[in-house]
Design a protein with these regions (language model features):
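C-terminal motif of bacterial Sec signal peptides marking the signal peptidase cleavage site
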Residues: 7-10
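Short, low-complexity, Pro/Ser/Thr/Gly-rich segments in the mature regions of secreted, periplasmic
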Residues: 156-176
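Acidic, glycine-rich flexible loop segments
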Residues: 107-147, 153
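Short, low-complexity, disordered segments immediately C-terminal to signal peptides
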Residues: 12-31
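Surface-exposed acidic loop/strand-edge motifs in secreted or periplasmic proteins
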Residues: 29-123
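Sec-dependent signal peptide recognition
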Residues: 1-4
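Short hydrophobic/aromatic-rich beta-strand segments that constitute the beta-sheet cores
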Residues: 95-96, 133, 159-162
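Beta-propeller blade signature
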Residues: 81-87, 148-155
């Protein structure tokens, strides 16, 4: 009889009492955005008078999804950019062109070309009818860049040259973030 009583006590002590259930808290899911980044659209313009001539220049940098994507060392992806330059002299268009990184291909080594984007542009000066801009092709969000000078002649012709004498004042340029 003692055995039956112990069995009953043992069975009744294992009964679960109803407890208030806590609401299930869902852990926030971190969404990883793997889409390519774009440098911000930038626009700059200015005017100047040299002698009897009035010059107006406009620069516009914008990301272009049709130019391909470049990945940095961390795996972050970036769209390449185009830079549009318009120069007017006495209200007539002297020069208008949209540049892509491929315009600099012959002056970049293969690896740098593959991993860089067209990054910045800045008006430099007008001297003896020549309008000059500094431009840069660089690794995205990096200090690694290749500077260039764009010279636009009085007739609207242009030439791109490597800038071997980069002046520090041109590093933070008009169209660079």
């Amino acid at each position: 009889m003692l055995l039956v009583l112990l069995a009953m006590v043992a069975c009744t002590s294992n009964e679960k009492t109803p407890q208030a259930t806590e609401p299930v808290q869902e852990k926030p899911v971190q969404v990883v955005d793997n889409s390519p980044r774009s440098l911000p659209l930038l626009y700059a313009t200015d005017t100047c008078k040299i002698g009897q001539n009035y010059y107006v220049w406009e620069l516009e940098r914008k990301a272009c999804d049709s130019l391909g994507v470049v990945a940095d060392d961390m795996g972050d992806k970036y769209y390449d950019n185009t830079i549009k330059i318009v120069v007017k002299k006495n209200a007539s268009t002297l020069f208008a062109r949209t540049f892509k990184k491929s315009d600099f291909r012959h002056m970049l080594d293969k690896d740098f070309f593959k991993n860089s984007i067209l990054d910045g542009c800045r008006f430099m000066k007008i001297h003896e009818g020549m309008v000059s801009f500094s431009m840069a092709v660089s690794y995205p969000e990096s200090d690694m860049s290749r500077p260039f000078i764009l010279n636009i002649g009085p007739d609207g012709s242009y030439m791109i040259l490597p800038d071997d004498d980069l002046d520090e004042e041109y590093i933070t340029d008009s169209l660079s973030s």
